[in-house]
Structure formats: structure tokens, C-alpha cells
Curated annotation (Swiss-Prot):
PANTHER family: HYDROPHOBIC PROTEIN RCI2 LOW TEMPERATURE AND SALT RESPONSIVE PROTEIN LTI6 -RELATED, UPF0057 MEMBRANE PROTEIN ZK632.10-RELATED. One of its GO terms (cellular component) is plasma membrane. The chain crosses the membrane at residues 33-53. Its main location: membrane. Belongs to the UPF0057 (PMP3) family. It is a single-pass membrane protein. Keywords: Cell membrane, Membrane, Transmembrane, Transmembrane helix. Coiled coil: none annotated. It comes from the Eukaryota. Pfam families: Pmp3. It is found in: Cell membrane. This is Plasma membrane proteolipid 3. Plays a role in the regulation of membrane potential. Could mediate a proton leak. Regulated by the spc1-atf1 pathway and so expression is stress-induced.
Length: 57
């Protein structure tokens, strides 16, 4: 799937603040909660999860 203009901004948000990138892609749901927990456990797992969600959907 090709990246759109909005996806580029979501990826930038995912690197700076991963839950924000997930929220912009999927809305307020389980994915955001999972990402917040991953960010609390470690910043890198949160980034990986956010990039996965953005690039998958």
C-alpha cells in the first residue's frame, strides 16, 4: 500500500509521540490503549507498534 500525504505526518507523529499517531489512524480504541502501555514499558516498542498500525491500515 502506498503512503499518502497524511500518512507521512502520522509517521512523524508516531516517532515523536506514538499514541498520537495511532489515535490519528484508528481513533480512540484498543490500539491506542495498547500503544500507551507499550510506551510505558519502553519507548521503542511504542514506536514499532505505532508504525505497524499506520502502515497496515
Amino acid at each position: 500500500m502506498a503512503l499518502t500525504g497524511s500518512d507521512i505526518f502520522k509517521v512523524i507523529f508516531a516517532i515523536i509521540l506514538p499514541p498520537l499517531g495511532v489515535f490519528l489512524e484508528r481513533g480512540c480504541g484498543a490500539d491506542v490503549i495498547i500503544n500507551i502501555l507499550l510506551c510505558c514499558l519502553g519507548y521503542v516498542p511504542g514506536i514499532i507498534h505505532a508504525l505497524y498500525i499506520i502502515l497496515k491500515y
